[in-house]
């Protein structure tokens, strides 16, 4: 990680003049022990900001929800898997004091590429066979519950396979047993661009997006509702607020990215080969508005970048982000109000 470009005159994130885009570096202010989070653009302690996050696979059917630890995630991916259900991947940087995280479920190969965009340590319990070609080659640091019994435990309040959980001590045991570095790579400069401090992205030319319905996910039918007072979106699914089981609090976020993606079936069993590299269209949603975007990626293991209609990289508002992977043949089932 190219750590700590600090401007003694401003103590702020450096920014580009073109389109106001923010340079994706962490800035450490004089006399403080905080840096800007790569996940949220908000202040976090130096220890948390320098440590690689975890990217945890979470079940999202009625047996797996509500999940635990989701409220602590800076970024959450939702993507379809076989059987019309979705899986979540929660990317968490500050997991030291979360009572439990889970339930942890198995890997699908496209989630590996999303996790790598954040230089995260990938947490999963088993995998679909199509992911083995990447896991067996150790192309991404990962903690597999099938082979690392010290990284997870089984709870007694749910039945298998919906009762695999982890926490700080278990994750650290797994990470240390594998010898993984917990520091960001030297050349990692973050994923998102965030609005410069003291400003916000308002999408004044966007369309109304006070309610975002994702009926493309026909099993859980999730949606988001915007609260203008808090400037956050509240998440719902299964006709009820989507909560974190640890706290009972409803999940919220400042940013929603709809990433439209091509795919082909792997086999008749419904396993999906989601295209994470070729690019496509989408939406960026914040502050009750939405704009059209397009996304690009220079390699399978690279980082996705999102651009507006003027081909300028979008700037997220600091805070939490949901990335919704929408298959191209189901875009028509997404609605904004």
Enumerate the predicted regions with their spans.
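A surface/extracellular/periplasmic glyco- and lipid-processing/surface-interacting theme
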Residues: 28-77, 82-337
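Sec-dependent N-terminal signal peptides of Gram-positive bacterial secreted proteins and lipoproteins
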Residues: 2-27
């Amino acid at each position: 990680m190219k750590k700590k470009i600090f401007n003694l005159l401003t103590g702020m994130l450096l920014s580009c003049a073109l389109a106001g885009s923010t340079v994706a570096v962490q800035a450490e202010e004089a006399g403080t022990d905080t840096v800007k989070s790569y996940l949220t653009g908000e202040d976090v302690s130096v220890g948390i900001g320098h440590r690689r996050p975890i990217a945890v696979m979470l079940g999202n059917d009625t047996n797996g929800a509500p999940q635990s630890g989701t409220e602590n995630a800076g970024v959450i991916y939702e993507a379809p898997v076989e059987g019309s259900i979705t899986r979540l991947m929660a990317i968490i940087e500050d997991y030291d004091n979360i009572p439990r995280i889970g339930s942890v479920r198995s890997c699908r190969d496209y989630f590996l590429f999303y996790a790598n965009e954040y230089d995260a340590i990938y947490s999963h319990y088993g995998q679909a066979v199509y992911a083995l070609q990447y896991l067996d080659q150790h192309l991404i640091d990962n903690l597999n519950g099938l082979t690392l019994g010290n990284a997870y435990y089984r709870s007694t309040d749910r039945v298998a396979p919906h009762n695999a959980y982890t926490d700080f001590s278990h994750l650290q045991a797994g990470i240390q047993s594998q010898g993984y570095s917990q520091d960001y790579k030297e050349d990692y400069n973050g994923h998102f661009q965030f609005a410069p401090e003291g400003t916000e992205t308002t999408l004044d030319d966007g369309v109304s997006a006070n309610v975002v319905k994702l009926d493309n996910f026909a099993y859980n039918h999730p949606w988001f509702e915007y609260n203008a007072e808090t400037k956050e979106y509240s998440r719902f699914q299964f006709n009820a607020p989507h909560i974190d089981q640890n706290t009972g609090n409803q999940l919220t976020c400042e940013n929603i990215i709809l990433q439209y993606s091509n795919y082909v079936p792997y086999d008749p069993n419904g396993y999906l080969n989601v295209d994470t590299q070729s690019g496509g269209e989408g939406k960026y949603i914040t502050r009750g508005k939405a704009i059209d975007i397009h996304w690009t990626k220079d390699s399978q293991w690279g980082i996705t970048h999102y651009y507006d209609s003027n081909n300028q990289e979008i700037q997220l508002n600091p805070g939490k982000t949901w990335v919704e992977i929408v298959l191209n043949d189901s875009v028509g089932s997404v609605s904004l109000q």
